[in-house]
Regions:
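Positively charged n-region of N-terminal signal peptides that target proteins for export
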Residues: 1-4
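Bacterial N-terminal signal peptides
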Residues: 9-17
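Signal peptide processing junction and immediate N-terminal pro/mature segment
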Residues: 19-26
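Primary mode marks residue(s) on the alpha4-beta5-alpha5 output face of response regulator receiver
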Residues: 27-65, 69-186, 193-280
Length: 280
């Protein structure tokens, strides 16, 4: 009898070991910083319109702001709300991307130049899983008052990834080649305080992740947005921004996505550690 109990006990122990090993193998590996490289989904949008409006900084005050170039939602103006934006159409290719994005308008020798197109990367920068931006969320990245170079982790100019011209805080002179025309990049923070949809300064509810982690006072990881405007010009010293000089780059984001679409993309692309790109 005792030998049978011993055999049964050994069998149970082996079974528990197999189950534990199988469960461990089936569990997705915890991500590391290297695993986050290339995890994204991408928006492709064309230019919509220009206006001296800013529904985040100057809501309900048309004509008060410096001039902005808008992509995404086609109805964005000083009076925009979540409801009006949700009712609008979009210049973005993906159905449901009715969010509003804007930057200061580029000037070439004093003449306004519209962006040819915009690419919006939604990336994962944190080891912790992400939450989608809540509906109506607003934020600004970059400093519209800057008169000296901002950190290039926030904003920079370049001539495209394939160009040999290095990225810089000042406007470069790009080759006279459509594939290497001037670009302006602005990178948004990806850590939220988890409470406020906006703040008086439009920035303090957000923080940048450091080595894959959010700070304790901004504990909620959200997608890291990179907004890139492409211009059909080569750049050079004649380029300025409507907010002043070459260093005052900044960008605004107003979340008016169809929320179900955004939540789905965050879940099946960013939290699943997939490179969805534009085809998602």
């Amino acid at each position: 009898m005792r030998s049978w109990l011993t055999v049964i006990g050994l069998a149970v122990a082996v079974w528990i070991s197999i189950v534990a090993h199988t469960s461990e193998a089936a569990r997705p590996a915890a991500p590391n910083l290297r695993a986050l490289q290339g995890v994204n989904f991408i928006g492709s949008c064309t230019f919509s319109h220009m206006a001296m409006d800013d529904p985040i900084v100057y809501p309900g005050q048309p004509g008060v702001s410096h001039d902005h170039s808008f992509v995404g939602n086609t109805t964005t103006n000083a009076f925009s709300t979540l409801r009006t934006l949700r009712a609008g159409s979009t210049t973005c290719k993906r159905n449901g991307e009715t969010a509003a994005y804007w930057m200061p308008t580029l000037l070439l020798n004093g003449q306004m130049v519209a962006p040819r197109s915009a690419t919006i990367y939604y990336r994962r920068k944190t080891l912790a899983p992400l939450k989608a931006f809540p509906a109506g969320f607003k934020m600004i990245a970059g400093d519209r008052h800057a008169t000296t170079p901002q950190g290039m982790q926030i904003t920079y100019w370049n001539c495209g990834a394939a160009s040999t011209v290095p990225a810089s805080s000042a406007v470069p002179t790009c080759p006279n080649d459509r594939g290497q025309s001037l670009r302006l990049h602005v990178n948004f923070p990806s850590c939220w305080d988890g409470q406020r949809l906006d703040t008086a300064d439009h920035v303090s509810h957000m923080a940048y992740a450091v080595r894959g982690a959010c700070p304790a006072d901004h504990p909620v990881a959200v997608p890291a947005i990179s907004l890139i405007f492409r211009y059909a010009i080569t750049g050079g010293s004649g380029v300025t921004l409507s907010s002043g000089g070459q260093y005052s780059a900044h960008a605004d984001f107003f979340n008016a996505w169809r929320q179900g679409t955004l939540v789905s993309l965050v879940g099946r692309c960013l939290n699943a550690l997939r490179h969805c790109g534009r085809d998602s």
